[in-house]
A protein has these predicted regions:
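Conserved AMP-binding/adenylate-forming core of the ANL superfamily
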Residues: 28-82, 99-104
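Short alpha-helix at the nucleotide-sugar/activated-sugar donor binding site of glycosyltransferases
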Residues: 85
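Structured binding elements
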Residues: 88
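Conserved small/polar residues in nucleotide/adenosyl-binding loops
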Residues: 110-116
Length: 120
């Protein structure tokens, strides 16, 4: 007997798949670091996250690897959030407000496979 409450595993990628399927044309609006507004739909987000996941795989990122992001909260970081976790890697977010020495220590301590950044 299957005692699970859901018919599918509760994965981060499942959240985005659901949003794309049921709310694909719904607009996501965020403010960029530069100050202007960025608009995209859930379908756009899902497509960009899949492309990024493929790029991560092409760069040697495998299931269970650790990938760090050093980025402000925004649409680029959200795309990385879904791409990294959707590819089966572990996302480690680094705070851009940390002192550079703290970032270096964190990166060396976590044994990252691939650090990624947006313009910080």
């Amino acid at each position: 007997m299957n005692a699970n409450m859901m018919q599918q595993p509760l994965l981060i990628s499942t959240l985005l798949t659901h949003a794309e399927r049921h709310h694909g044309d719904q607009e996501i609006v965020s403010r960029r670091v530069e100050g202007d507004l960025h608009r995209q739909t859930y379908s756009d987000l899902a497509q960009r996250a899949r492309r990024m996941a493929n790029a991560l795989a092409a760069n040697g990122v495998c299931f269970g690897d650790r990938v760090a992001t050093l980025a402000w909260n925004g649409y680029r970081h959200m795309e990385l959030y879904y791409a990294v976790s959707g590819s089966g890697a572990v996302l480690h977010t680094l705070n851009p407000r940390l002192h550079p020495d703290q970032v270096v220590w964190t990166v060396s301590y976590t044994h990252l496979t691939l650090p990624t950044t947006s313009r910080v």
